[in-house]
């Protein structure tokens, strides 16, 4: 299989358990870029954070941010951030959660929520089960998704995910998904891994992701990313 593009998550994949960018991943991604294979950042993070990571890596494939809610790539869409969905259902979910959880809502919602265009994020000082309980009785429960990224909990619009937006960005740029190698570590990475021709789980990935991957790295975090790029791309 020819790999024409790499799609990779940030937290827990190209960063370690302290959220530090792994030099090994950076080095491998730059070598792939030099060989003509671009890297796309696919993350639950805000698009500005993701784009900064893209620049630091020396990558050129663009960004899928907020679990698929936003897309950005230089020289695409007039260099404007493309918002795939609005916050209608997410805002309604926030209102419902605030009414149900009270002060617990304010204490646990992420400080970067003001920068998010399509989703809401909560620190893991609150559990997924507590948020699920808080969402009981929500009128539009079938319109939203609750993800655990390993570092935070995300309330997103069900119409999009990392996979659908990665596929859209690749199609817009003439890249066949069968020739994409996707790498991740957690629950919210499943959606974009299953769209790719080559599915890779880094060594520290959750078990269910490993079971549904074509290749499981022997190494963790960025060392796993380097391992996969050297094996399948370079």
Swiss-Prot record:
GO terms for molecular function: magnesium ion binding; phosphoglycolate phosphatase activity. The active site is at 9 (nucleophile). Keywords: Carbohydrate metabolism, Hydrolase, Magnesium, Metal-binding. It comes from the Archaea. It catalyses: 2-phosphoglycolate + H2O = glycolate + phosphate. Mg(2+) binds at residues 9, 11, 185, 189. Its cofactor is Mg(2+). It is an enzyme of class 3 (hydrolase). One of its GO terms (cellular component) is cytosol. Its EC number is 3.1.3.18. Substrate binds at residue 162. Catalyzes the dephosphorylation of 2-phosphoglycolate. Belongs to the archaeal SPP-like hydrolase family. NCBIfam families: HAD-SF-IIB, Pglycolate_arch, PRK01158.1, SPP-subfamily. HAMAP family: GPH_hydrolase_arch. This is Phosphoglycolate phosphatase. It comes from Methanobrevibacter smithii (strain ATCC 35061 / DSM 861 / OCM 144 / PS).
